[in-house]
Amino acid sequence: MPKQKTHSGAKKRFKITGSGKVMKQQAGMRHNLEVKGSDRKRRLNADQVVPEVDAKFVRRMLGK
């Protein structure tokens, strides 16, 4: 049976930490930033841990 290909969109959006958690960039930092407060922008700029329910599918797309 052939190998499963890595999902090209997923490999650009997610990364797996050394402990196995799946990280993603929080949405909302692309445009209309002048109407968002600095506290909100700081919170949105941080990476976010993907919930374990979704991380299972992300790992499968990444071939892990």
Swiss-Prot record:
Q: Which GO terms describe its molecular function?
A: structural constituent of ribosome
At the top level, the lineage of the source is Bacteria
Q: Which InterPro entries match?
A: Ribosomal_bL35 (IPR001706), Ribosomal_bL35-like (IPR021137), Ribosomal_bL35_CS (IPR018265), Ribosomal_bL35_sf (IPR037229)
Which cellular components does GO assign to this protein? Answer: cytosolic large ribosomal subunit
> What biological process terms from GO does the record include?
translation
Q: Pfam family of this protein, just one? A: Ribosomal_L35p
Q: What keywords were assigned to this record?
A: Ribonucleoprotein, Ribosomal protein
Q: Which HAMAP family match?
A: Ribosomal_bL35 (MF_00514)
Into which family does the record put it?
Answer: Belongs to the bacterial ribosomal protein bL35 family.
Q: What is this protein called?
A: Large ribosomal subunit protein bL35
- The species is Leifsonia xyli subsp. xyli (strain CTCB07)
Gene encoding the protein = rpmI
